[in-house]
Amino acid sequence: MSTSDSIVSSQTKQSSWRKSDTTWTLGLFGTAIGAGVLFFPIRAGFGGLIPILLMLVLAYPIAFYCHRALARLCLSGSNPSGNITETVEEHFGKTGGVVITFLYFFAICPLLWIYGVTITNTFMTFWENQLGFAPLNRGFVALFLLLLMAFVIWFGKDLMVKVMSYLVWPFIASLVLISLSLIPYWNSAVIDQVDLGSLSLTGHDGILITVWLGISIMVFSFNFSPIVSSFVVSKREEYEKDFGRDFTERKCSQIISRASMLMVAVVMFFAFSCLFTLSPANMAEAKAQNIPVLSYLANHFASMTGTKTTLAITLEYAASIIALVAIFKSFFGHYLGTLEGLNGLILKFGYKGDKTKVSLGKLNTISMIFIMGSTWVVAYANPNILDLIEAMGAPIIASLLCLLPMYAIRKAPSLAKYRGRLDNVFVTVIGLLTILNIVYKLF
């Protein structure tokens, strides 16, 4: 073998799938699997079997193409170590940097409000149905839970970051185990309700409207956009110098594809298992009760008549506890992102970007008061969680995940090679449909 052949062979070996690629695949997958997936089965199963089958077809393309578009935007910056804010500033100037800062903050903050409502409802449901205690005042419960989380965050943030990282895989394993454990309770109700003669494409409960609203919950549930920038920077630093940017882009796409497959497999299996255990009518009831599907499952098993099996009793309590842990995990993770974003906005507009004018402790205190105060108000008001996701959470995520990369591809010279592709049309349509949910909710 010649020297040149040895070099090529060595480079091929080094550029093949690495342990770090597996780590990032699992990291992207773990980031997406949080409390948001506990609402996906409700919206997906709301319209019955046919809409959820259509969502199954759309799930992987939405997850893969949208995140790949955002990764391509992050890859387009001249600095391999530059994050998404720096890349957007490079393409669109300081105004673009301000816009991306606002988008990141407003993409995460409404999620905290959603989780504030969810943790309150889940705890109250567990308190009343599983523990059998008298109902508590909603405002008191929300305040107590938020103060508890604020105390933990203030005095044990580093510990919580470690705990959250350890909780990711037990939570995913719990979802899979619950999905498998529900199989003995599957029934044919959702299949029996399929009447091809009475199916409607349009109308309030038509297939198209159900799938349209389902797209927004998929954008919300299949979302690991907060970690994409860090992921791309890591891969650029690892691969770009030796193998070039095109190779790095293909490697990132490969990792995103595998993470999306894992994510869709776990979430869709969980959704189908819930739907075959319950029914579309049960999903509608869960939406009306404003609780995640695990809490509804716990109440479902609690209300079973006759002698309960050990499995049914275990599912009754395990479902609620897993839901509570999942929401706590997601709340802490999104709180840290919201805190960082709000600190940046306060520093930029309140102190003209001068870090010497205010201490980090003061910034954290101001931000915490606003974040926890606004979350308590929303939790006390108890708006419908799915409506919040469809009208606020998902559209803002879509503007960041779908429309910003598509605009950059159209305007930025370094992204010109991606213009005119069919997948760009798909990503743009998904982004616009998700944002148009706001109009649908208003009218």
UniProtKB/Swiss-Prot annotation:
Membrane topology summary: Multi-pass membrane protein
InterPro entries attached to this UniProt entry: Amino_acid_transport_2, Hydroxy_aa_transpt, Thr/Ser_transpt_TdcC
Residue pairs linked by disulfide bridges in the UniProt entry: none
Gene Ontology annotations for the cellular component aspect, listed alphabetically: plasma membrane
Transmembrane parts of this sequence: 22-42, 44-64, 97-117, 140-160, 163-183, 207-227, 261-281, 312-332, 366-386, 389-409, 423-443
Compartments it resides in: Cell inner membrane
Taxonomic superkingdom: Bacteria
Alphabetized UniProt keyword annotations: Amino-acid transport, Cell inner membrane, Cell membrane, Membrane, Symport, Transmembrane, Transmembrane helix, Transport
MF terms (GO), sorted A to Z: L-serine transmembrane transporter activity; symporter activity; threonine efflux transmembrane transporter activity
Catalytic reaction equation(s): L-threonine(in) + H(+)(in) = L-threonine(out) + H(+)(out); L-serine(in) + H(+)(in) = L-serine(out) + H(+)(out)
Family: Belongs to the amino acid/polyamine transporter 2 family. SdaC/TdcC subfamily.
Chain's role: Involved in the import of threonine and serine into the cell, with the concomitant import of a proton (symport system).
The protein's name: Threonine/serine transporter TdcC
Source organism per UniProt: Escherichia coli O45:K1 (strain S88 / ExPEC)
Gene transcribed to yield this protein: tdcC
